[in-house]
Amino acid sequence: VRILKERVWNELSKNVAVMPVSTKIQDTILIIKIKDDIFINLNDAGPMSHRFIKKVVKNYKRKFLLSISGWGDADMINFYDKENNFIEPLAAKKHPVGDYLSLIAKLFSANYVIPFSSFHEYQREDSIWANRYVTPMEEYKNGIHHDITFVEPFAFINSEKDGDISSLPLKKKKLVIKKSCEFKDNWNDVLEVDDKKIVKEYFDKFEELQDKVGFINFV
């Protein structure tokens, strides 16, 4: 086990070095240097520490941004109002994902974007309804800015030769719907009064939700 030092280059081999950057939300961004190429792996950390990272990568020619993206289906969309009507999430507006990726790339002075950590779908019988908000693969390049190069996901990038980028010929896996009980969840379980306290204490721990969620009904 090797503990990597933060905000400095940690050399892994002759051509590869990494720099972890922790953020104020207790997440980490990983900057990867392969020869003269830079890969900024945000994963789901968001556009944090961009001023520092921009300085680190400013002298490199090819800078690739890897970031979670999409319409926003994975971000707490299962909400209802007091009349038990489903609240349509922001994901329903289907904002061009390429525009979002381009803006984030420019924040870090990256000139290439690669969709990353974004290729999920829902397979449980009690969550497959959310698949209508999942971003199709072809939508990730929609809205890409003219000065940003889009790289298809699952690509091979040759760091010794500019322009040598090729995508792997992958096929989408067939969706197999599974029952929630396979995951130890049973909607027929009877909840007790003490469970209400457990639920309330759980959500009360998230300070950021206090001014965003008006109420929690225990049903």
Positions of predicted regions on the chain:
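A generic short-segment signal for beta-strand/edge and adjacent turn/coil regions
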Residues: 1, 9-11, 33-37, 81-85, ...
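Solvent-exposed, charged interface segments at domain starts and junctions
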Residues: 1-2, 86-87, 213-219
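Cap/insert and terminal regions of metallo-dependent hydrolase folds
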Residues: 52-144
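Extended non-globular C-terminal regions
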Residues: 200-219
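Core dinuclear metal-dependent hydrolase active-site scaffold
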Residues: 4-62, 66-73, 157-204
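Noncatalytic linker/hinge segments flanking ATPase motor cores
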Residues: 23-25, 44-45, 79-86, 106-112, ...
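C-terminal, active-site-flanking charged/polar segments
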Residues: 139-147, 155-158
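Short acidic-hydrophobic, aromatic-tinged amphipathic segments that line or gate anion-handling sites
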Residues: 2-6, 149-153
